Design a protein with these regions (language model features):
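Asp-based, Mg2+/Mn2+-dependent phosphohydrolase catalytic module
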Residues: 1-23, 129-234
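Active-site neighborhood of HAD-like aspartate-dependent phosphohydrolases
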Residues: 2-61
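Short, acidic loop-to-helix structural element flanking the phosphoryl-transfer center
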Residues: 15-16, 21, 96-123, 129-133
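Conserved SAM-binding loop
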Residues: 33, 104, 121-124, 156, ...
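Helix-loop "lid/cap" segments that line or gate small-molecule binding pockets
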Residues: 45-48, 67-81, 135, 168
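Anion (oxyanion) recognition and catalysis
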Residues: 49, 115-116, 192
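Helix N-cap/coil-helix junction residues
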Residues: 53-55, 81, 141, 172-173
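Metal-dependent phosphoesterase signature
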Residues: 54, 73-110
Length: 234
């Protein structure tokens, strides 16, 4: 068992590799598939610094993985600007920084393709739909997902369970039979609240998502072996 906080009930992921396999899989995007979360965090710090402002570590940690509108509101308050103005400035710079080629994080392409060949697969992200679709296209992985659920598709974003519940419904699977994979505390809270099994793959320093199984990256060889053993259910 990985050194994680105890969950409400024993998880099949406490054994590695598990003797269990999911009916469907739901992946986060930013910070899990690609290092966009780190770029977004760096932009926020640059923006605050240019305005002579900052966030304390607790506030910074709590904002990681939250929807753009929540982050913008917090930064606008910190710098003393109208949220609409701050949001326009931040998003314009974010689009400029994201204009270059996207590099998937280690193990992402092989893992996504292996899952997609065997089980229904969704992505669930706090990003707006246009940014999410652009990221998946940029990674060359858009065709691997049966559905993509964005911030625009639900009433409440992560850490509420809505995104994960919507993804499970779209895939025709019960949440308890789904595997979620997340990198942030915010996303982990959402997946667990939805009742899914969860693997955490944190990529941002300071993030300690609670999950029954934690991996250093999606390039984990035991993960690859486990997925390769799933029978095809598509």
């Amino acid at each position: 068992m990985s050194p994680q906080s105890e969950t409400a009930a024993p998880s099949p992921l406490e054994t590695w590799p598990p003797q269990w396999s999911p009916s469907a899989v739901v992946l986060d995007c930013d910070g899990l598939l690609v290092d966009t979360e780190a770029r977004w965090l760096a932009l926020q710090e640059d923006y605050l610094s240019r305005h002579g402002a900052g966030l304390d570590p607790v506030a910074r940690r709590a904002l990681t993985g939250r929807p753009i509108e929540v982050v913008v509101a917090a930064l606008a308050e910190a710098v003393g600007k109208d949220p609409h103005l701050a949001g326009a400035e931040l998003l314009a710079e974010h689009e400029e920084r994201m204009g270059g080629p996207l590099e998937p994080l280690p193990g992402v392409v092989d893992t996504v393709r292996a899952i997609a060949a065997r089980r229904p697969l969704a992505v669930a992200s706090n990003s707006p739909r246009d940014l999410l679709e652009g990221t998946l296209e940029g990674l060359g992985l858009a065709d691997a997902f049966d559905t993509a659920i964005s911030f625009d598709d639900v009433v409440a974003a992560k850490p509420a369970p809505d995104l994960y519940l919507a993804a499970a419904a779209a895939l025709g699977a019960a949440p308890a039979d789904c595997l979620a994979v997340e990198d942030s505390e915010t996303g982990a809270q959402a997946a667990l609240a939805a009742g899914m099994q969860l693997i955490a793959v944190p990529s941002i320093p300071g993030q300690e998502p609670v999950a029954p199984r934690r991996l250093d990256s999606l390039a984990d060889p035991v993960l690859a072996e486990w997925i390769a053993g799933w029978e095809v259910r598509r």
